[in-house]
Structures are given as C-alpha cells and as structure tokens.
C-alpha cells in the first residue's frame, strides 16, 4: 500500500468530516473475459510480417505481438483461413518457403494466441484468396462442382480443418462461416439473392460441419455469420430464417465508417435492432481508424485524410477516441464484441498482391518504428457491459 494512501486513511479517521481527495488516481484498467465481451484483433498478417523483418516494440523493448495484445486487454484473436493460397509464396522472388494464411500458418497463429490465454476466431473465406462483398470465388479445387458436390466439399473441408485443430489443441472458440458474405459465398452457386435456396443449402453444410466437429470437443465454437456494413445487415438476414438459416449464434458485421452510411453514434441502435429482431448476439468483426495521414513506406495507404470523421482527427488521441466510442456504442446496444482489423500490419518486407510493406500502417496500434501507441489501450477501458 502506498504511503500517501496510509496518510489519507489516518486523516480520514482523525477528521471524519473532511472530504478526501486522493493524491493517486486509481488504476482504471478493466480486463474482460471473451465470454463476456470479445476485445478482439485480427492478427492474420503477423506471422508473415515477423518472417519478413517486422519488429514489434512496447515502451521501446522488442516484444512478441501476441504478448503485447494480451497485456493491453485483447482476449480474442481472429485469423483468416484461405484454402490453397499458393500465390502467397509466388508473390515473392524467389518464392517464399511456405504459404501464409493456409492451415499451417493459421494453426501456428492460433497456438501462439492460445499460449497467451486468448480465445480465437477462425474466419473461413472458402476461397484461395480474399473473399469480400466484391469477390466470393470458390477454391480452384472446387471449380465445376454441382451444388450437391460443392456442399460435400464445404462440409468435408470445414470438418477436416476443425478436427485437425482439435487434435492440435487449437479448436477455436468462434468460427465464421464465410467472410463478408453480402452477395453469398462460393459464387455463382452460393448467391444469396438469386439462388437463395442453394445458398442456404451450402452454408448449412458449413454450419453442420462446425457443429459436428464440436460434438467431441470441450470447446463448442460459436458460429458467426459475417456481413459488411451495418446498413446491409437487417435486409440480408430478413426472411432467411424461413428459408432454413437458423443454426448460428452471432451476427457479425464490418464497420468501416468511410464506406458506411451509418454514423458512429447510431451503431448502438443498429446493434440493438439486430439483437432483438433475430435473437442473436451481435459483434463488429472488423473496424479501423487512422492515427496519422503519413505513410511508413511506398505502398499507398487505403485510408487518407479525406475519409475522417469530424471530431476524430487522424492522431493517436483521435484513433483511441474512435475505438473507445465505438466499443461503448456496441456495449450500449447489447453487443458482445469488437475486432480491430489488422492493427498490427506494420511495414516490413511482406508482400501481397498489390505491393510490399503495408497499405494499413496508418491504422495500426503501432507507430512507424513499431512501438505501441495509445489506440491499443481502448480494450482495458471501463464500459457498461453486462457481467
């Protein structure tokens, strides 16, 4: 106990009528359990960044990024999984020794997160590359399959993946059946709008595999259906229950303010509407905000100063305020989690399809030297979250 605290206690006893003003501000940090509220981060690039020379620091000291995120309050780490991303090797010259975001790489990340006591969200893209609202291309191995054979492939791939993770002690606590599947997934067969019955048939194959894999595991993954942007979510889910899409646990959505028509201050209303209408938990699976308009390398950043919110400058304080206020909005609406997307995608010699380095270094929780910045601290703030 601090000496100042002891003195204050003695004065309080001797002069009980005096109002006490503590000299030391109490520690306001709060660490949450993922079952209460997921304080999440997508760290899918981290293994590749480390392999390609990236260094993470905290207070000037080199540190394992998984340790950093755990110490700053993260309780759930998200990883994307591609089927056969051979391009992640051939994008290098000479080709890299191994693929990234394939099963082996993802298992490595899951075990690293698990070693720090964090839960995991596994994001099946059901593609060899990025799957999002603009592109949902099935793996090359599944080309030309009938809808029935495609469902079998989805089921067997999902089941086999989770069974292998279970055997490795890496069963995830959360599993996404697809990534930002606004148009559907594994197109054209799995089109949400023009082939709704086939879409439900296919995604239920993924869901059944997740349930079957969890039957013999002590970890029962919660199933997430993930849509991009809150304004799209209600219409997307409306009517699907009657079509047979019911067996999932969480509605997840991406919230990128620069591409959304929904103001930050209205997020709680959307979360509450979805939660009460569909009787599911609700999470934000992806979000971000810049701490600078600068660039650490020659890879052009995706977000610039023209895409800022009034009252949230592209500064360390502005990024922190955005993450804090958005988390408070989710909690106020009864939501159960938030994930920052790739907040550790610092510059390095890592390559993707478009460049070397990072097109996201202005949005990370690290400065251009790799040191943690204030934005990462939002996870241990106190929020009105049900115990």
Feature map (PLM): residue ranges:
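Aromatic-rich peripheral "rim/lid" segments of glycoside hydrolase catalytic domains that contact
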Residues: 273, 292-325, 329, 333-334, ...
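Aromatic-lined substrate-binding rim segments of carbohydrate-active enzymes
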Residues: 61-141, 195-221, 264-277
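Conserved, mostly hydrophobic/aromatic
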Residues: 41, 69, 123, 175, ...
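Active-site cleft segment of glycoside hydrolase catalytic domains centered on the general acid/base Glu
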Residues: 101-105, 132-241, 246, 261-269, ...
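Glycoside hydrolase catalytic-domain groove-lining segments
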Residues: 63-66, 212, 216-222, 231-307, ...
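Bacterial Sec-dependent N-terminal signal peptides
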Residues: 2, 15-31
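Surface-exposed, active-site-proximal loop segments in enzymatic domains
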Residues: 49-56, 83-106, 128-151, 183-193, ...
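Boundary/entry segment of secreted carbohydrate-active catalytic domains
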Residues: 25-68
């Amino acid at each position: 106990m601090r000496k100042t605290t002891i003195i204050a206690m003695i004065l309080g006893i001797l002069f009980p009528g005096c109002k006490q003003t503590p000299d030391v501000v109490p520690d306001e940090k709060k660490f949450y359990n993922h079952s209460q509220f997921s304080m999440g981060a997508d760290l899918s690039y981290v293994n590749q960044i480390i392999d390609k020379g990236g260094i993470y620091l905290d207070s000037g000291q080199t540190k394992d990024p998984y340790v950093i995120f755990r110490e700053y309050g993260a309780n759930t780490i998200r990883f994307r999984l591609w089927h056969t991303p051979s391009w992640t090797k051939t994008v290098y010259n000479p080709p890299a020794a191994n693929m990234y975001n394939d099963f082996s790489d993802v298992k490595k990340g899951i075990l690293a997160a698990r070693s720090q006591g964090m839960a995991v969200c596994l994001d099946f893209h059901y593609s060899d590359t990025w799957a999002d609202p603009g592109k949902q291309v099935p793996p090359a191995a599944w080309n030309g399959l009938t809808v029935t054979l495609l469902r079998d492939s989805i089921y067997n791939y999902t089941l086999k993946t989770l069974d292998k993770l279970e055997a490795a002690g890496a069963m995830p606590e959360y599993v996404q059946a697809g990534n930002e599947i606004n148009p559907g997934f594994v197109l054209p067969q799995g089109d949400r709008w023009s082939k709704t019955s086939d879409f439900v048939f296919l995604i239920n194959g993924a869901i059944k595999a997740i349930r079957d894999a969890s039957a013999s595991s002590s970890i029962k993954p919660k199933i997430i259906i993930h849509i991009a942007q809150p304004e799209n979510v209600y219409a997307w889910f409306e009517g699907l229950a009657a079509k047979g899409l019911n067996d999932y646990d969480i509605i997840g959505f991406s919230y990128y303010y620069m591409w959304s028509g929904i103001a930050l201050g209205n997020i709680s209303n959307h979360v509450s509407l979805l939660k009460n209408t569909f009787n599911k938990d609700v999470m934000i699976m992806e979000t971000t905000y810049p701490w600078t308009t600068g660039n650490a390398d020659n890879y052009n950043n995706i977000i610039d100063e023209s895409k800022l919110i009034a009252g949230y400058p592209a500064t360390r304080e502005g990024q922190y305020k955005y993450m804090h206020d958005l988390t408070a909005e989710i909690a106020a609406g009864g939501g159960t989690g938030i994930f920052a997307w790739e907040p550790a995608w610092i510059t390095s010699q890592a390559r993707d399809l478009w460049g070397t380095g990072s097109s996201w270094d202005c949005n990370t929780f690290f400065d251009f030297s790799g040191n943690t910045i204030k934005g990462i601290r939002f996870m241990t703030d106190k929020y009105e979250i049900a115990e």
